[in-house]
Amino acid sequence: IALCDHPEIEEILTRLVEMGYSISPASLRLDDITPTILRLLRQSGEKTITIAPETGSDRLRRVVNKTLTNDEILDAADMIFESGMENLKLYFMIGIPTETDDDLVAIRDLTLQLRERMMKYARTRGHIGRIIGSVNPLVPKPGTAYQWLAMEDDRSIERKIVRIRSLMAGIDNVYFNIKSERHSFYQALLSLGDRRVAPVIEAGHRNGGKWR
């Protein structure tokens, strides 16, 4: 359940702000963001909003059943930065079925457009924030459309990781954290494994959290 799903979320946030609480949501669904919610979060001291475009292209977003468009994402970014927010965190996925190099380039292009929105408002404040991206290989999860999908092979994911790092290199005020294919394999093991995985988890714990 997303934060903004609560029918009285604006009233709840208003009361929390009045009580002096700092409010820092993990992430916000773009289609639920309102100027009032952003204003209240900013009043509570929050400077960063996290959103999940998932992909850089509208086409690939539809593959994962997301109907949000890049234009809508950019409009939401205008609202976010206009509210006084300084930083924007982004969640992206790679390894989605039908993904091509054009889709990887689209991550860079969308990030650059979001950076332009940030810079427009930063100039009026005299302070430049940051765009912080997180890229994760697709991990099939139970109960989703891709729960039976095999993960993309390690070499293919590694090539895409190298490509993303190359595309994002040298962009001022933009920082990307890209999870390794090994880390994603561990996620898949924990998400999809049954009781037979228990001895592996126990062994990893005995080994100080190291899975090798």
At which residue positions do the language-model features occur?
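Conserved SAM/AdoMet-binding glycine-rich loop
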Residues: 1-89, 94-130
